[in-house]
Amino acid sequence: ESVPRALDEPETESGPASDPLLPTGGAPGTAGAMMGVDGGTGGIMAGIGGEGAGLSAANTMGAEASGLDAYADHATELASIAEFASYGKLLTTSPVNAPVQLTESETEYIVTAYKHVFAEHIVLQYNVTNTLAEIVLEDVVVVVGGLMEAGLEEEFILPIPCLSSATPSGKVYVSIRRDPSLPFPLATLTNTLRFVSKEVDPSSGEPEPEGYQDEYQTEELDVGVADFLQPVELDFAMTWDTLPASASETFALTALESLDASCSTLVELLGMQALGGTDVPANPSVHTMMLAGLLACPGGLETVLARVRMMHQPSEGVTMELSVRAPSDEACLFILSAIA
């Protein structure tokens, strides 16, 4: 089927064209992935957030500053750990401001996670809290599954020696090597908290000398496209034509009920910066959003751009054309894979 005229207008020489025109009729184009309400997990359906997802134009600057501060804090902390000293510059941390929740907050063991990407490594940081005062956990590690399937290799684990009522929280680090032949690995990882459990003697307040090996399964941890991207502000029109590789695909997103929802979802899913307030549609029917990011490639950070032309029809949902410019075809296809 043909792509709607609203999504098929030509680019200008200096960059993207202006907002598309309303279509005169006909069904939306179906080139690319067709993703409806029952489209399954992964891709854009996995990235749909609740109210307030994404960044609005009103709070973009504040959120960006907050993100940069948090990124700097992560970089400083990781640089202070001797085992990571040779890893070089931290390229991205995801999520930057608040970790992924891998357990419910009311459980006996609370686990959250950050994903830190370096040029040749990924470091998984697991924040672990023991809420049981009558139990001491020793030699706490996280056993990560699903690495081999993604072309990743675990190098070592930095455990937590002890979690007790005096020091209930700590951090486990799992160092993973990136395969140079698979520069952008995507994975769904299983996480098993493993430790020696010792009961505390109520009379002495000391742990029993003997304990037993125990483990606790948490939620899965996804490594996705956004984990390799860092938002960046730049001049979109000037940069667009300087990037040599390009790719474009059209998607019918029948599960998204508005252009506002589409913008919020894409900002969250791609991990890129919406430029010039383009994450806030002025027209409920047609809109163009421009995004910029730095992609964590094996050689360092590389600039990537995305232009999203969207059209909403109440009977069809949102039809979207995603066009990407990047230094390589591989990088372009990687960005598109966030939706496909």
Located regions from the model:
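A structural signal for beta-rich interaction modules in eukaryotic proteins
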Residues: S2-A340
